Structures are given as structure tokens and as C-alpha cells.
Amino acid sequence: MEQKRGMRKTRVGVVVSDKMDKTVVVAVERHVQHPLYKKTIKRTTKFKAHDENNECRVGDKVLIMETRPLSKEKRWRVVQILERAK
């Protein structure tokens, strides 16, 4: 019996650290509205993502996708490098 896998979450972010082996830290920015003042504020979340070939560098814009837990904190993997750092 085949099971269909649900749609996995994807995010676009910027690599802020590539110091680890096969892992990068990706900062994903989102905009939320302040509950009282209704001003739109930027909020940043950092995700640890699997980078199999150590291709990503700091400043690269990447697409990450949710995956099974790979370690204690790593649940995302780099799918594609959208834009290289200058």
C-alpha cells in the first residue's frame, strides 16, 4: 500500500553561518503585525539546514525544505541556491 507524502513546507532565506560541516544556518524573515499598534514588524527565525556538498556560503539566498529530523536541531535541507553572495 503506497502512502502519499503531504506537501512539505518551504522557506526562502539567507545563509548567515557556514562554519559547520554539511550544515548551514539560514535566517528566514517574516512580517507580522503588532497586536496593539498594527505596525508591520520584521521577525527573523534561524533554521539549521543540511547542505550535503558544503556548497553554500554566507550571504547566499537559498530555498530550504522541511525534512525528517537529521539531528537534535536540524529538520530542514537546502534544496536550491537561488542567488550567490556578491
UniProtKB/Swiss-Prot annotation:
InterPro entries: NA-bd_OB-fold, Ribosomal_uS17, Ribosomal_uS17_bact/chlr, Ribosomal_uS17_CS. Keywords: Ribonucleoprotein, Ribosomal protein, RNA-binding, rRNA-binding. GO terms for cellular component: cytosolic small ribosomal subunit. Pfam families: Ribosomal_S17. The keyword Disulfide bond does not apply. One of its GO terms (biological process) is translation. GO terms for molecular function: rRNA binding; structural constituent of ribosome. One of the primary rRNA binding proteins, it binds specifically to the 5'-end of 16S ribosomal RNA. HAMAP family: Ribosomal_uS17_B (MF_01345_B). Part of the 30S ribosomal subunit. Belongs to the universal ribosomal protein uS17 family. PANTHER family: 40S RIBOSOMAL PROTEIN S11 FAMILY MEMBER, SMALL RIBOSOMAL SUBUNIT PROTEIN US17M. This is Small ribosomal subunit protein uS17. It comes from Caldicellulosiruptor bescii (strain ATCC BAA-1888 / DSM 6725 / KCTC 15123 / Z-1320) (Anaerocellum thermophilum).
